[in-house]
Amino acid sequence: MEKKEKKAAVEKKKTAESKSSGITPKDVTVCKATEQMLDKAKRDGVETAFDRAANMKACPIGADSACCKHCSMGPCRLNAKDPYAKVGVCGATIDTIQARNFARMVASGAAAHTDHGMGMLDVFREVVHGKIKDYKIKDTVKLEQVAQSVGIETQDRSVEDIAKDLYEELERTYTQVEGEVPFVSRVPEKTLETWRKLGIVPRGAMREIMEIMHRTHIGVDQHYENITKQCSRTALSDGWGGSMVATEISDILFGTPTPVQADVNMGCLKEDYVNVIVHGHEPNMFESMLASVNDPALIEAAKEAGAKGINLTGMCCSGAEVLSRHGVPHAGNFMSTEAVLITGAVDAMAVDVQCIKQGLASVAKCYNSYLFTTNPRCHIEGAEHIELVEHEPKKCTDEVVVKAIARFKNRTAQVEIPNISNAGIHGFS
């Protein structure tokens, strides 16, 4: 019991320090809506990322990347102020250590985009072979353009045949171990010549990520220039591989965006509607959610619960995508995701992968809002998991909406929505 009391006292002290840190919401954001919600959070006693940043001193060794923990002989701590005074137990210099640390960051970032692109390509394959009925190829012009850019014949051929060939060609982006990724055909000639001269043309995304991780292991690559060279190759496998595949397949499946007028900021939330937010990175979940919120049966259920209807908004990456593609209002970016929950108006937030703070779970709990994870790659402690199965995606998104309606009916949080929305023209592609 004594330990619990001490822990509670420490937490109380931390909260007090946070409130008296002297940093105001105006100091940390230029977004007036976020500023208003951070003020509300202070009144409500709710901690956000901004509070933690203000009260957490950054690790000075980590800031200089002067620590290596890649093997069991360490961790080894070097002095960035006198970088060459000593080396790690294995003899690694600070140049090697910093290059290795940076390389692993590159590998992680490239893996995130590559895995996302590979996931989109998997969905494309299942659609092309008729195994997923909820999605279909919406932009056949884009399909032909992309196919032609990688040398696939399109004249007098069916959409299905072109799509099957395109899938097989783009799959090489990930699985190939020699040669060059397909979209290298788009690289300007002089640029490609330079890449080839430097030996940094990506062979395949998985090959480059695997190799860079191998090189950063103890006893492998121990020259910062050579490690950095592989960083470039891995980064290019992302930009001209995983990311580009994800972009093109998304447009082919769900339609290439065209200019559309839509509102952004938290003013797009509506107090008298069931508010559902989708946040993450993968457009397929959002496309299914669009079908769910427009389902007449679910709209009627929302009205029976006392709402005027269902209001869908997006946040962050996938939110920006459907903002451009469908004109769905966008409530904010990564740093606004906690703030939007503080409005008390969010009945459910459904997330998939990337840019999702673990802190959302505790903020959602404070305002009796639902936070749902939907992807097997991303579970969050404190959030409810409803898995989206690609062959029946609406089953997941329908359940999210049903639970959002139930939360609307039993709202307990005080609602405060910033009266701020900004009109804009989006969808340039």
Model-derived regions: residue spans:
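Metallocofactor- and cofactor-centric catalytic cores in central/energy metabolism, strongly enriched
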Residues: 2-429
